[in-house]
Amino acid sequence: MTDIREYLAHKPLLFDGGMGTYYKAAPGVECELANLTDPEGVKRVHAEYLAAGAQAIKTNTFGLPRMAAAQMPGWEELAEAGWKLACDAAAEKDAVVFADLGPALDTEAAPASSAYGLAAQQFAALGAKNFLFETLSSDVGVVEAVKALRVAVPDAFIMVSFAVLPDGYTREGLLFRDLLHRMEGSGVVDAVGLNCVSAPGAMKKLVQGLGETRLPLSVMPNAGYPVVTRARVLYQGKPEYFAREMGQIAAAGVRILGGCCGTTPAHIAA
């Protein structure tokens, strides 16, 4: 796949599912560190999602903006390793790789725009063309970072995805519809969407109530809602339920589909 925009004009794009909740990291250890400590394990997860039918996969770098902002030793090597592992796996299936960037803190010492910018520019230097800013509770600093990224990589495909509760608001009290309109008005974002926090049924209701949008929509819900059993966090939601709800989400016009926490290759294959 060479041109995502052209691809989306003809059919939906299927992403992978959760990385951190599927990869069995040791308690207290950041999943991203596995890029360096267990590269074969990370590549195996990528390969399983690709075998399940994913046409796009995310780098295992969700926490990179915060790591970059804190100047965590070795964050650049972690990004490079995550990028290479995903690219190696995707090359075997002609899939596309998205540089994955989770939420950044916004402080006076380290503005969110700087954190996003550092992480995104690191991937740009590695040759990344596709970027996903995900699980955001606000748009603070995002558009500024994306504008700079657009200068560095003019033909980049850039997605911004927000974590929204079933009532349509983020945990910072921002309405998704307003965030969507701001991303559409920015002129630099290629797709906007929802991921994490909510289950497929809740996201289905949200997108069905949106009406027509100017940008392609992405929806990547959790498998269900988390329950704690014997000190383990488990997500309710069988692959069959996930597939049924995602089919209805696609029927509502959503062009980019995938999964977040609790989803597995079985959910993507379904």
Predicted regions located by residue number:
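Domain-level signal for soluble alpha/beta catalytic cores
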Residues: 1-270
